[in-house]
Amino acid sequence: MKEEIIKIIAGVAEVPEESINLKTNLIADLDLESLDLVTLVSEIENKYQLEIPDKEIKKIQTVEDIVNFLSSHV
């Protein structure tokens, strides 16, 4: 799952997958803006056929946050 998430993030952020790890901060390290985050969440929701509640989206700061959320909901 981690590798799939990193691949999605790399595509949205337009960076090499190798530059992303669990501790990578989506905003500080990858310079993602709000529209990028919406795109990222949408792609993850489509891939895993689930809806991430807004309150959970606001908590997501790192790749690890996404992986942890999905691990407990997929």
Please provide the spans of the model-predicted regions.
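Conserved catalytic core of two-component sensor histidine kinases
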Residues: 38
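Phosphopantetheine carrier-protein modules
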Residues: 13-31, 48-59
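Thiotemplate assembly-line natural product biosynthesis machinery
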Residues: 1-18, 71-73
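Residue-level recognition of oxygen-bearing side chains
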Residues: 25, 35, 62-65
